[in-house]
Every structure is written in structure tokens, then in C-alpha cells.
Amino acid sequence: MDAAVRQQARERMKGYCRVCPVCDGRACAGEVPGMGGLGTGSAFRANVEALKKVRLAMRCLHRAVQPNLACSVLGLDLALPVLAAPIGGVSFNMGGGPVTEADYADAIMLGCRDAGIIGCGGDGVGDVIHECAFESIRKAGGHGIPFIKPWDGEELNRKLDKAAATGCPVIGVDVDAAGLITLRRQGRPVSPKSPEDLADMAARVHGAGCKFMIKGVMTEDEARIAADAGVDAIVVSNHGGRVLDHTPGTAEVLPEIVKAVRGRVDVLADGGIRDGVDILKMLALGAQAVLVGRPFSTAAVGGGRDGVAAYIEDLRAGLTAAMTLTGCADISSVAPHILA
């Protein structure tokens, strides 16, 4: 990422994020609200450390010199297998300085659209968060995925219906936000959902003509529950280490989850992904695409729409190089055999 964008983000996010040279959760342990991990920060660090342990087998005797990064996930054609993760709450998570919630949402949605991928919109306390995300998706011509928190009662249904009205192709619920401390502190009712609740949500979203994905699956049994409930895609995620301390890293649990529901739902993953090499590792472990969170926040706060597009170009270049040096001609050829 451009040094000037990082420095601008560091100044604007002072007191909320240090924009460390290596974003591994060590300096910001316990800083929630903010951009850190909950408690000791162990789960945040586990995401980074789990990916760090994955090794790639370098191959240089092949014909894969111009790999094709394009893929299709949830029926969406993407220039590379990346989505910007749903993050909201600029004022209490990022500081942001002059960057408003609307500015942030526009930077993510429009920057991602410009680069041929898709951004996800956040939700939270205060209608401004989801309203700005919804409006940005509308500005992008429906090119975005709104995520809704697992609210209790009618609020969940109301927001699902409003999300569908943006013209989006997919709606998500980050079920792991049931443990988000920023919501608990503000007395907002979120809760875990039963299999029956999940099936009801899937039916409501499908009835609106959208596909349905959930974020926050960390076990094989819950992946099967999601598939049985009619969910179209799951994101293997521990919410960036922000909801439960001492969970494993997502890269540790991803392969078995993929094995449990292969062919039934699309499987995506997030957690500690910073560059193109990290993307390739997650794909080799079985993910069909990845969500990237904190670096997109840095890019959006520090550089706006152009900063987001430039960061995506960094990811594209890094993934191209990594695929070339592991002999992968296209995304479909990425498999566990490239792991050392």
C-alpha cells in the first residue's frame, strides 16, 4: 500500500489504529472499540499466525506465466477472488478524522466496483451505518453486499427487507456479531440464531430474489447446519478476533470445514489476509474467495476511493506473482498440491 495513504490513515485513525508496518494484532490487543482484537488479542494474532505457518511450494518449470485471476462466487463474476469485508462504525472504530460513514462506504463500494470486485457494507448501532452502506450500494448500481447484524425480533427482518431494496444480488448476516462488545455496551439486542431462525432468514432473503450468505462459521457442524438451512455461502471467520478470545485462526479450521460442505455451499474465508500470497494460501486451503478487512479500512480512510482501488491493484499484483511462482494458470488450478 502506498506510503502516503498509510501515513494519512495513521494520522486520521490516531488513537484507534496505529497502521502498523505488520498488522498482526500485537500492538492493539484489547482495543475494542478500535481496530484491535478482544481481550488478550489472541484470536486476532491466531489468524495471522495460522496463515504464516502455511508454506507454498515454489515451482518455476511450467507455462503459467500470465495467470487468470478471474473467478465466479455466488454467481458474481470477480476480477480476482477478493471481497472487501463489512466494516462500519468509522467514528468509534477508526476515528476517521474528516472521513464520514458515507465517505467510507462510498470509497469501499465504488473503489471495489471500479476494480472489478465487490465490497460489503457494514451495520451497527446507529442507523447511519447501514443507511450509508445501503446508499453506497445503490450508487454503485446494486454492486455490493449489505451485511446485517443478528438483531433480535423484527429489527432483523426490517433490515433484511431494506437491504434487498438496494438492488444487491446477495445479502449477508454476520452471525458472529452476536458477541460483539460494541453492541453489548450500547444495549442493542443481538443474539445467536437457531437452525430454524437461519432457515427463516434464508427463505426471506431468497423470497426477495437475493442469495444469502452468513459470516462467522468456525466449525464443521455449524457449516452443515448452514447448508441444511439453505444458506448459499458461508464465510469462515472469527470476526477478526473481535468477539471471542482464544479461538483458532481461520486458516486452521478452513480445510475441514470445506471438506464437510464441499459442493453444497460456497465457502469463503477471512482473517489475517494482507496480501496476494495470503489470498493464495487461503485458496489452496479450500476457500473459493476471501474477505479482507483491516487493510481496506486503512486504504479507505487514508486514500478514499482511489486508495481502495490502488490497494486492490497491490493484491492483484501480489496474487499474480504468487500464482506464477506456484505454477497456477488460473484460480481453478489452485489446490493443496501447491502447499509445501
Regions flagged by a language model, labelled:
Residues 2-79, 334:
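An N-cap/entry alpha-helix motif that binds or orients negatively charged groups
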Residues 43-126, 130:
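N-terminal functional module of multi-domain proteins
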Residues 85-101, 145-154, 210-218, 274:
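Active-site mouth loops of central-metabolism enzymes
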Residues 110, 139, 151-269, 276-299, ...:
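Alpha/beta enzyme core
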Residues 128-154:
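Long, hydrophobic, well-ordered secondary-structure blocks that form the structural core
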Residues 289, 297-300, 304-315:
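C-terminal structured "cap/appendage" subdomains that terminate the fold
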Residues 317-340:
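Charged C-terminal helix
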